[in-house]
Amino acid sequence: MDDNEQFSQLRNVISTTASALLGIENLDKSILSSNSRYKKILSETIKNLGGDDSLVKLRKNFSNLKRQEESHDAYERYSGDDYFRNQLTDSRTTFRVLTYLSDEILKASLDDEKSNHDQGLLEFTNEEESGTKNTSSLFQGFEASLPILNERLENNDKNKYIKNSEGNDHNNNNDNNDDKNDKLFEFTNNYISSVSIDTEKISRSYSMKYLKTLSEDVLRKLNFTLIQEDVTKEEVEDLSIKLERLKERHQSACKRLETVEQDELFLENALSLIKDRMKFIQEYDLELESNDPEIEDINQNEKSYNEAKESNDLNTSQQNVEDLKPNTFVNNDKDVTVAKSEAIVSKVKTKNQKTINRLQRFYNEENRKSRKLPTTLLQSHYEPGTNIATIEKAHENGVYCMDFDMPFGTLCTAGYLDHTVNVWDLTRKVKVAEMSGHLATIQCMQLGSHYNMLITGGKDAMLKIWDINLATQLYQEDQSSIESDYNSCIHTFDSHSGGITALSFDSVHLVSASQDKTIRQWDLVNGKCIQTIDLSSVVKQNQTDIVNIPDFYSSSEPFVTGSLQCFDAALATGTRDGLVRLWDMRSGKVVRTFMGHTNAVTSLKFDSYNLISGSLDKSIRTWDLRTGSLSDLFAYDSPVYSIDFDSSNLVSAIGETSFKVYNRKDDKQWECVNSAEDTSSIYHVKYKNNYAVTGSNDGTIKAWVV
């Protein structure tokens, strides 16, 4: 064997060792098998490197070892284990480091034996004719990375020089240094192009020597480019694998965060419930005495439960043990429960009769909202359009009106032909209270933003203010013995002579609209009407065709005032003549009128810049409050029954199986659609902080991520 062949075999050995050091991250256990492909290549290399001179040199290198048996030629040993023994690591780890070959490097080694070792990747031959495609070797990849490494080292030296020259001024120019570092990072991660060829000079040249020299230079650069391509492809594949792993970890962390936030919301609700219960007991003096039969019954149940748990009796089933668990809400003695509930009602009545003005007493720190939004909202982990909660058959005849205070907070709903208000916990998706008192269908409602209160307006021409905390506490008692038409209602406004169709309130004043063609302003502290606006001379019947609202939703004709909103001294109203009016509540006069709708206005809302209204004319219009002009218009195939919006999104319900969403920032429209099994139509939608709640004509309530 001549020197060139021996040099080629030695290069293979060096290449395999270096590849093991660089590719240990993707080590495969199959490399350790006795019939591995690598073992065959290594044996072939050793055989080709045989000869007396090689063995003599090898034995001389081992002559300084302590033990004589370790100085034997490693190639003559039967197992080869001693060759991989050292004082730093075990033999298995050493074997992995020294013998690993990836499939790519192995293929490169085999192809390299068949190809010209010195000409690089490309030759003046057709790859299809040769049947093989050359790939870059480890040495070529190292050679191709040298220009990038040199540039990086030079830039690092420049960066150190800049930092040292700045000295004490480094802190003052911290922002400038950050910009320089960002640019440096961007530069070192970019591909360094080596293409600088004058194509015009080639077209004008007649020198074969020049063209031949240039051809060799172009071939070298093309080889370099292909090597860079191989290296970059491997880097991209490696990054793709890492990104996939990071994505899996991200999904796992999101699921864990969802569980933690659900526990956080549940515990906050439980803490709020405990505090409200304590306030309720203290306010009405309902604390149990030490000899109260309920305490004795609880202690007895606790004792029986512990005895059953400790006895390990084989005849006691798990269900029997569960039946013995203490229950602080349900008493086994029905007579005692009824008597206790009647006693509680009696105390509540007495307490309320002693109070001169229950409405004034309500506005205190105890009734302020204590719940706050979690730091990271759950809906941020869901895709937009996801239905995250469903309450089926919340009402028998369809949802007529509703409102909620915050995502995963409290939801209040009323159904068509239903005289009661249901209160729901959106976190647990359960009903926590029920408030009765209206004599007809409840047509509008609004939850307080600062106090745990709800104001409702009904077809019975009455407005009622409800104490949500008190209603929740009384709902825990035996419903058969408690008259609920008075206890959780703080105050009733009864000056209207027609059904209440719309209401709005802020911290001080309440404004309501009625079918008696009046708008009244109320003082929420003393409960008195302080202003009345007559609409009989302003609102006239629209001459266009009237689109009737479905029977479950309304009467045979639209409301005189379909919607209103007040803020401070400003009031906006939408009426059945299709006009949207802005009022000054201090003077009771119209200051601006928005004309454009051709049918009754069903809903509206305004912020600091825009007023948006929906109408039975199948359109939504956006008005500029500063100029009074129309700034946007949306047309649909069905009448618009409900809208809501914030600075990000506008949502609307048009009586279809989906509700519409318009992204105000990206100027895009999309929709949240019911499942294929749910054919109910959505007529009501409320929206806050990317969280929407919808009500359908079959009584279903759903929560969505928007």
From Swiss-Prot:
SMART domains: WD40
Coiled-coil zones: 227-264
GO BP term (any one): peroxisome fission
Keywords assigned by UniProt, alphabetized: Coiled coil, Membrane, Mitochondrion, Mitochondrion outer membrane, Repeat, WD repeat
Family as reported in the entry's similarity comment: Belongs to the WD repeat MDV1/CAF4 family.
Residue windows of the WD repeats: 394-434, 437-476, 495-534, 554-593, 596-635, 637-672, 677-706
Presence of the UniProt keyword Membrane in the record: yes
PANTHER family (UniProt xref): COATOMER, COATOMER SUBUNIT BETA
Official protein name in the record: Mitochondrial division protein 1
GO molecular function: ubiquitin binding
Entry GO terms, CC: COPI vesicle coat; mitochondrial outer membrane
Species name: Vanderwaltozyma polyspora (strain ATCC 22028 / DSM 70294 / BCRC 21397 / CBS 2163 / NBRC 10782 / NRRL Y-8283 / UCD 57-17)
